């Protein structure tokens, strides 16, 4: 009887999201875009530090280690922001957590821009990191709980798209402020303005999020079924669709334990937690933020000597990153998550190896006497193909999968663990790259990053599920029923 009921629910859900429901309400896209502005703030900070670092180092006579800490301090602050977000988000809601993050981001940007020493700047960036961590935790979670299942992958991918747009906007701003802008008679190098200008988008995010509806799943978690129905009525097409979704959420809420309690006693939930941790480790160990944080230094290592060449090359990196993200948005709900990931890892692995092999040595650059060797152009081409591979796959899709694989009662805990892992790994990458580049050389450093992509393909084959077109509640049901991880999306 229970099996027949499940079949009936599946048939009803398919009918509700059938041909007549292919067109989604415009409000769905407006809500998703506004929530994804959290990704814009994240991207702006990744991009802005790339261009500002050279001038910060000059202003404070910062050592290599201090420069690494300027980059990584925000990332370790983001770990703290992520860890407290699970508690805040569950108690006060996804929307309110995003509002708090916007306020902290504004304050952090202001304080960073008026720092009077390298130590104070590092401390301010830790504070700013709390906001970035809170936003990176909450935005994909909110998007997954708002989105219809038929376009869930695309809408969550909008978060990564906004990250890439933020990066390219910051690169453009940095290029203008570092090369052309005249202030108090000084042309270029205005790192304080680079950092302080981030106040503007954080205020825009606050205003936009203020008008968003609350997550219907969070409302149901708080026993507010009528409010959840009202929200769903604005973003779903039919009463049948709303009724089915509410029924699924109620069934999922029959699991009364919280995330930590589930982790201690439920081995199936533990598997999902470790999968999420593994996925976020993978995203960072691809080496993407090596390129994003240190793009000007990579261009310099390749033989592009002038600041203008380095900054405009960095802008082009950001533009390619944005454009390639549209590949994931277009195909993640058509082709599925895993086929795109396999292709992306292959492209990234080959590209990093090309970068490592083709990167000219110091001796070659010295012998070139100011001319850029052909090998330098090959290595930079490898950087661009790597960006395409990442932006079309691991960039958005890992955020998608990590927002899908946890049951509602443990979703805050699960996303806390996976997102905190992302920031820890991100911080380690940011803190070690310049040291690796100096100690191992460019060739060995990039070959190491290229080699690990093969391991990631094996990881996806063995453990990662395909979640295309499956409701969050069905994925949770399969997980808690003890299905193997790679089959919880079937």
What are these regions (language model features)?
Residues 2-227, 231-233, 244, 253-490:
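Alpha-helical transmembrane bundle of multi-pass membrane proteins
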Residues 233-239:
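Short helix/loop segments within enzyme catalytic domains
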Residues 239-245:
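Boundary/linker segments of alpha-helical solenoid repeat arrays
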């Amino acid at each position: 009887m229970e099996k027949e009921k499940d079949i009936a629910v599946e048939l009803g859900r398919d009918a509700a999201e059938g041909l007549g429901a292919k067109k989604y309400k415009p409000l769905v896209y407006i809500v998703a875009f506004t929530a994804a502005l959290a990704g814009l703030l994240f991207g702006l900070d990744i991009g802005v530090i790339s261009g500002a670092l050279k001038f910060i180092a000059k202003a404070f006579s910062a050592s290599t280690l201090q420069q690494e800490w300027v980059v990584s301090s925000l990332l370790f602050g983001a770990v703290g922001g992520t860890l407290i977000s699970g508690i805040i988000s569950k108690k006060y809601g996804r929307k309110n957590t995003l509002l708090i993050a916007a306020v902290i981001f504004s304050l952090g940007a202001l304080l960073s821009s008026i720092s009077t020493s390298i130590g104070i700047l590092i401390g301010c960036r830790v504070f700013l990191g709390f906001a970035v961590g809170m936003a990176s935790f909450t935005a994909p979670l909110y998007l997954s709980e708002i989105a219809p299942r038929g376009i869930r992958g695309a809408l969550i991918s909008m978060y990564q798209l906004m990250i890439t747009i933020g990066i390219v906007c910051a690169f453009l701003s940095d290029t203008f402020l570092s090369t052309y802008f005249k202030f108090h008679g000084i042309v270029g190098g205005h790192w304080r303005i680079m950092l302080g200008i981030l106040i503007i988008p954080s205020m825009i995010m606050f205003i936009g999020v203020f008008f968003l509806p609350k997550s219907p799943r969070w409302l149901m978690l708080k026993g507010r079924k009528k409010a959840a129905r009202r929200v769903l009525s604005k973003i779903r097409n039919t009463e049948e669709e709303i009724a089915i979704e509410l029924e699924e959420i109620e069934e999922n809420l029959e699991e009364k334990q919280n995330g930590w309690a589930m982790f201690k006693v439920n081995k199936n939930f533990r598997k999902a937690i470790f999968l999420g941790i593994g996925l976020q480790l993978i995203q960072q160990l691809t080496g993407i933020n090596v390129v994003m944080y240190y793009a000007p230094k990579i261009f310099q290592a390749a033989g592009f000597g002038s600041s203008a060449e380095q900054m405009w090359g960095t802008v082009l990196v950001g533009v390619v990153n944005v454009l390639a993200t549209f590949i994931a948005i277009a195909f993640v709900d058509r082709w599925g998550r895993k086929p795109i990931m396999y292709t992306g890892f292959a492209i990234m692995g080959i590209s990093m190896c090309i970068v490592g092999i083709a990167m000219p040595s110091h001796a070659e650059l010295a012998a070139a006497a100011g001319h850029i060797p052909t090998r330098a152009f090959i290595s930079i081409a490898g950087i661009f193909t790597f960006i395409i591979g990442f932006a079309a796959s691991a960039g958005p899709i890992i955020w998608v999968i990590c927002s899908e694989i946890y049951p509602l009662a443990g979703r805050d805990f699960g996303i806390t663990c996976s997102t905190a892992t992302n920031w820890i790994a991100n911080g380690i990458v940011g803190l070690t790259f310049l040291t690796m580049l100096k100690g191992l050389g460019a060739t060995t450093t990039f070959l190491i990053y290229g080699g690990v992509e093969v391991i990631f393909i094996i990881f996806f084959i063995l453990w990662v599920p395909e979640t295309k077109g499956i409701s969050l509640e069905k994925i949770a049901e399969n997980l808690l029923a003890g299905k193997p991880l790679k089959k919880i999306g079937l």
